[in-house]
From Swiss-Prot:
Recorded family membership: Belongs to the ATPase alpha/beta chains family.
Protein name (record): ATP synthase subunit alpha
Organism in which the protein naturally occurs: Aromatoleum aromaticum (strain DSM 19018 / LMG 30748 / EbN1) (Azoarcus sp. (strain EbN1))
Cysteine disulfide links: none
Site positions for Required for activity: 373
UniProt keyword Cell division present: no
Amino acid sequence: MQLNPSEISDLIKSRIQNLQLAATSRNEGTVVSVTDGITRVHGLADVMQGEMLEFPGNTFGLALNLERDSVGAVVLGEYEHITEGDPVKATGRILEVPVGPELIGRVVNALGQPIDGKGPINAKLTDKIEKVAPGVIWRQSVSQPVQTGLKSVDAMVPIGRGQRELIIGDRQTGKTAVAVDAIINQKGQDMFCVYVAIGQKASTIANVVRKLEEHGAMEYTIVVAATASESAAMQFIAPYSGCTMGEYFRDRGQDALIIYDDLTKQAWAYRQISLLLRRPPGREAYPGDVFYLHSRLLERASRVSADHVEKFTNGEVKGKTGSLTALPIIETQAGDVSAFVPTNVISITDGQIFLDTDLFNAGIRPAINAGISVSRVGGAAQTKVIKKLSGGIRTDLAQYRELAAFAQFASDLDDATRKQLERGRRVTELMKQPQYAPLSVADMAITLYAVNNGYFDDVEVPRLLAFESGLQQYVKAKNPALVTKIMTSKELDADGEKQLVAVIDEFKKSWA
């Protein structure tokens, strides 16, 4: 069969007209260099700050440096398989992590992936790790307490729901112990907890998880772990991931407590990333925005109004306020609270619990230094009975420390000074508390009432804690109705006081 030229041209024209090409537009670049988990990517246009980039092998990275002709990105996870010339795709999405009640009782990494070997987490929702903190209009003042179960904290530096209270001290002073005790004491308090472990040994995190399981605390706790063996990028994003998981409860009219253990290691990880990205170093080689690193995280902890909750849930939850309470931990070097990161976080938070090495070594645990520990907003949230009974405790301790230092040089002391020293010695002893043994409000009220009214004054110091424990058990056995009344009303009225005095007097007679 032969075709003439006109037929051939008609055939070609019809083919061209009927040609359909499926064109897909894709923002793609090429890896120029890979060093220590940092990649430089050339050819990516329209990339957002913090956008997720997709590398070969189902690996993702975060775009952190947006420069004129390249993008500096940090790889989340393993980067050994990424080589120069590999294609990189922009996803157009900001990093999100799974949120919701499905995560409760699980141990996850900074990306919300389970690492506890208990199978997948079928979370229905995800949320961005970087979010804007609630505005002033949507906040409410702190007025409800977070009971830690520690006498020295609840009496001297009370914490309220929605507060940010810093726990600061040298290594091995019991910072994590205070935080873990606070989590254990939330059992039955209608509070969800998130424990974020940053840059710690995997064995240390496993110990904390085991203790939480032993005390039944994993029933309301999520553990986010970025271990020391993980990349700096994972340690940097872990607190933001944990915060997003906590905000899920806050924005739905529930209460949550988040512990960042510790933010010093997050600052180190961020410093490492920034130096590798060739950002100019500042004080202590930290980048210029290290204050913003922590302020944007800690400002997300707040108590939000019922209007915020109603708006967020589209009217499903009405008349309930939500809160996210943060307990960030900072590790100091040789007690230097004037270093860069400690001063930053002190200025951001609503108070600090300072743990002292000397007190810890002297056996006073928790080793809280009453002189420089403070809670700027917690007083308004303190339980009524504890507030009423704890007034003189802090002053007694602070004055005792000063007098004790002075008394070392003075040979003869007047009666008033000797009396004050004796009282200070007893109050110091009574503030001691074993780990994983948080006290109820009623137990605390019994101890504080007894110490304020001189019932411990004639008990020898070594026997004080045994006397205190015996007294608490005796009151519970002899007058359970009074204990229940204190627990429910959170107050000690004149009638309750009369009953308590009678029981304490009875106990003192039987105590030998």
